[in-house]
Amino acid sequence: MADNDDLLDYEDEEQTETTAVENQEAPKKDVKGTYVSIHSSGFRDFLLKPEILRAIVDCGFEHPSEVQHECIPQAVLGMDILCQAKSGMGKTAVFVLATLQQLEPSDNNTCHVLVMCHTRELAFQISKEYERFSKYMPTVKVAVFFGGMAIQKDEETLKSGTPHIVVGTPGRILALIRNKKLNLKLLKHFVLDECDKMLEQLDMRRDVQEIFRSTPHGKQVMMFSATLSKDIRPVCKKFMQDPMEVYVDDEAKLTLHGLQQHYVNLKENEKNKKLFELLDVLEFNQVVIFVKSVQRCVALSQLLTEQNFPAIGIHRGMTQEERLNRYQQFKDFQKRILVATNLFGRGMDIERVNIVFNYDMPEDSDTYLHRVARAGRFGTKGLAITFVSDENDAKILNEVQDRFDVNISELPEEIDLSTYIEGR
């Protein structure tokens, strides 16, 4: 969503040596580990259209991957996203599902989604993914355009009706725009896959820029790659407006930028007293407190309210409608403290949350990650405090430190405000 005029001027830029990108064969989608499967319940957390969920089930996916958990909730809201994650972690599904979710196919003869990549093979593969996930959306039209084929064929395709989704390589897409065959004036989603491959090569980068300038200002921009060097990140961000940045180094590591993580050793019966003390001394915008059961969620939210900490609870015992209603109240800042079971740990995002408490230790390192990721959303500051009350809690905390290569230290007597509050 960046202003087109703010793009870097690459004409004066010193051309760095770039090696020609080989037409690598894109990884096959049936390789184990690709998309780390999707359980329909996991994807239901993202509140996707029933037609999309049905296609997901048909594909046999079970659990959303780390990348999907982090990106999809923001992507479906139209947020700009810059994401780096290794191949086979389900990056493609992020933008395919997010754009299909936002698509309103009643707008015929209008291209709403443009996805570009650097090779013909990858373009073809992405178009096939769109076809798979839009299986139960019969009005959605997808087309793929790339070099090496007669351009007249592409022009005929466009003449018979503009597709809602266009996938292709920059050279061919630009040729179709220059020939006035492809109109992107109403485009809503601009996606680059393997973005560094396109933006590192000066000629391809200029093509991408020219295409970008032919699209509206208020569109969503998403960029994905397996490798994003520190040098190329600012170039990507020139196309974007306050993007959510997600960097997954490998399947085990998700870097949480700006998040301070601490633990407190205490007995089970000391948890409430410690929690109230910390809520008194810490400065927070909004807080999420995670507990392990519905009963504890109900009891703690009531206790907090009695102690003049107005809280709202969300747990798996509620109907979907009630959960969403309470989630919206919290999101609208009607309450500043939320008590939740793991149900809330995945796929929901509140930008004002800057402190997360693990009142009860999560059952595994994955759950820990999804819980603490609610605070300090990528690039913002946040604080995660975990209560450790027995040997099993300590064991899980050690697993978290080993798996994610982080050092979680004991909570100090005083915490510098600037480490967990923006602008301090």
From Swiss-Prot:
GO molecular function, one term: ATP binding
A Pfam family reported for this protein in Swiss-Prot or TrEMBL: Helicase_C
GO biological process, alphabetically ordered: chromatin remodeling; mRNA export from nucleus; mRNA splicing, via spliceosome; positive regulation of piRNA transcription; regulation of alternative mRNA splicing, via spliceosome; secondary piRNA processing
Principal location class: nucleus
Presence of keyword ATP-binding: yes
Enzyme class, first EC level, given as a word: hydrolase
Annotated ranges, domain Helicase C-terminal: 258-419
Catalytic activity as recorded in UniProt: ATP + H2O = ADP + phosphate + H(+)
Segments crossing the lipid bilayer: none
Compositional bias per record (Acidic residues), positions renumbered to this chain: 1-16
Coiled-coil parts of chain: none
Residue window of motif Q motif: 41-69
Functional note: Required for mRNA export out of the nucleus. Probable RNA helicase that may regulate entry into mitosis by down-regulating the expression of other genes whose activity may be rate-limiting for entry into mitosis during embryogenesis. Binds to salivary gland chromosomes and modifies position effect variegation. Promotes an open chromatin structure that favors transcription during development by regulating the spread of heterochromatin.
Protein name as annotated: ATP-dependent RNA helicase WM6
Species of the source: Drosophila melanogaster
Protein's gene: Hel25E
